[in-house]
Every structure is written in structure tokens, then in C-alpha cells.
Amino acid sequence: MSLEEIANYIVSDGKGILAADESNPTCGKRFDSIEVENSENNRRDYREMLFRSKGMKGNIGGVILFDETLRQDAKDGTPLKELISNSGALPGIKVDKGLVPLVDGSDEVVTQGLDGLDERCSEYDSLGAKFTKWRAVIKIGDSMPSDDCINANAKALADYAAIAQSNNMVPIVEPEVLMDGDHSIDLSFDACARSFQALFDALENNGVNIKGTILKPSMVTPGSLSEKVAIREVAEMTVRCLKENIPSDLPGVAFLSGGQTELEATAHLNEMNKIGGFPWKLSFSYGRALQQSALKAWSGKSENIFIAQDELSHRAEMNKIAALGQWDIKLEDR
């Protein structure tokens, strides 16, 4: 498959992305909430449960993995990446190395991981990964985000994207504007717009093939400590921000859920697709908003596997329907 074919496939027909690339420490936090030990075997069992869910088929086009998972085998010896492929989804890999302060003492951060990235990508390509992901973090606060922060992260994302494409893998570029804080939806709109402008300028300057790239942005929402606004307002502001700042030849936008509840993430996505009138697919790349109910239902017990899989399958199906603009809250009744 070409880069363009891979990117288009991942978001085709309402399909989206299951973000299962939690680092081991983050996985530990999730497991703490259900009182399960954060062991290699438990991480494998949990992800095997997800990837064997019936609802993967037809609803999930790609799965983002952590390094460990790309190399792991299921209990019966089948590579986990093969379970993903068998469901009709493509395996992908998180390649960044986390956040460091932009400058000493700064509250702002930049993502590291460019050192040795070409070699890592070459290996991931040989292991069967079809796409990659790199997350940048933009904070809103006093004098934040600064131009320096936005530009440094845009450059790192563009450098990463060029390296991923040179190794035959689609880059997912993720400029996450954090919800943390009491900022207004207008400040969120401004931070997203500036991040998009800088990112696509940097991608173009680096010769990145936009048709073989996927954007994983935040939705335009008020800060988590601010009053919530109507679903329609989030949808309208987000669509406007994208239309004003994103090139039309980008194949897909796969939103992060960023601390939204499962239902909020689905409702917002649906409302945007009901608005319509944009050249790219608007889809999902959700972690917690796909996994939360499944994780709770599983709780580390093998006898709960089928109930947990039903939860994941349901959320995957609901989000596919939302990516087609056809979701309704009544569909949540089971």
C-alpha cells in the first residue's frame, strides 16, 4: 500500500483509530483504577482482549501501539499485531519519547525523540507497522502558548513526519492543546488555529506528503475548569478552525478525546459530521473514550472478557456511526 492508500484506508467508511499506545507507567495508572497489577502479562491480556473484540471489524481502521505491544504475542502465540491485521485494521506505533521543558524552568514543553528516529522507524517498518504517531503538547495559560513553543513543536512534528514517510509509514501528527485550565473556548480556538498554521507551514517546508498524513487534533473546547458549552458550539468552532487552517488535500482528521467522557467524545464527533461540508474525513483516534467502559468491565478477570469486549465493540460502533453523522443518543440503549 502507498502512503496515501494507508492514510485513506484508516479513516474510510467511518472507521477510526483505537489509541492503545499507553506507556507502561500510564497503563499502570489505568490498572490502578481497577486494582490490577501492572505486569507485562496483564498488559498483554488486556490488549489481547481489546484486539479480539468483534467490534474491531469494520469500525477500527488502525490501532496505535506502544513498542512492547508491537513485539508481544497473544497467549496462544499469535503476534498481537496479527490479531489487529486479522480484524481488518492496520497496526501503528507511537515513536516520540515524551516531553521535556522548552527551556529550563519553563512551563511549556517540547517533544523529544528525533535522535535515532530514522533507525527506529526502519525497524518498526520491518516489524509491520504501517503508520506512526508523535504527540506535541500545547498549554493555555499566562502568556501561553508562546510562538516559540508552537514553532518548536511544529518543527519537531514536521521533522518526524518526513522521517516516518521516508520509512514507508504514514505519520499521524498530534498537536494536542490541553483542556487543563479555566480558559474560554475562544482561547482554545486561537491556540488550535496557531498550532495548525505553524504545523502545516512546517510540513510543507519539509516536503511532507500531506496526502499521506493524518492530523490528530484536539477539539475546540473550553478549559476543563470552565463551564461547559453546548455540543453544537464545540462542533461549529472546531469545524471552523479546521476549515480556516487546514489544507484540503489532507485525507483525514482523527480527533483525540483529551479527557472527554465516552458520550461527549461521540456526541461532538457526530455533530461535526452533521454540519459537514469539508473535504477531509472527520473521524476519531480515541484512547480512554473507547476503552474506559471495557477496562472497568474487564477488571483483570478472564471470566469478564466477553462483557468487556462487548463494551469496546459498542463504543467502536457508536463512534463509527458518529463519524458518518448518523449517531443518536437512543442508540446507546442496549
Predicted segment positions?
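Conserved, mostly hydrophobic/aromatic
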Residues: 39, 134, 173, 215, ...
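Alpha/beta catalytic barrel-like cores
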Residues: 1-127, 140, 228-237, 243-244, ...
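Short coil-to-beta-strand
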Residues: 86-95, 124-136, 164-175, 210-212
